[in-house]
From Swiss-Prot:
Gene Ontology annotations of biological process type: translation
GO cellular component: cytosolic large ribosomal subunit
Family in the record: Belongs to the bacterial ribosomal protein bL28 family.
Name of the protein in question: Large ribosomal subunit protein bL28
Signal peptide: none
Keywords: Ribonucleoprotein, Ribosomal protein
GO MF term set: structural constituent of ribosome
Length: 77
């Protein structure tokens, strides 16, 4: 399973660890993904999402129905 948020599309980024001596080594910045079951009142069922913390905030802000409609329009749910 890819480390990608189903709501926002956030995926791992690459960057550098930088030591005190300014030595650089490659690293990955992973999104803060959570597996969540969210109750959808209109469908009277639970929906499982692999969602980032930013995605959870979007669900709180816009509502699960609007977020699911957007996912279905993109063909992802």
């Amino acid at each position: 399973m890819a480390r990608v948020c189903q709501v926002t599309g956030k995926a791992p980024m690459s960057g550098n660890n930088v030591s005190h001596a300014n030595n650089k080594t490659k690293r990955r910045f992973l999104p803060n993904l959570q597996n969540r079951r969210i109750w959808v009142e209109s469908e009277n069922r639970w929906v499982r999402l692999r969602v980032s913390n930013a995605g959870l905030r979007l669900i709180d802000k816009n509502g699960i129905d609007a977020v699911l409609a957007d996912l279905r329009a993109r063909g992802e749910a």
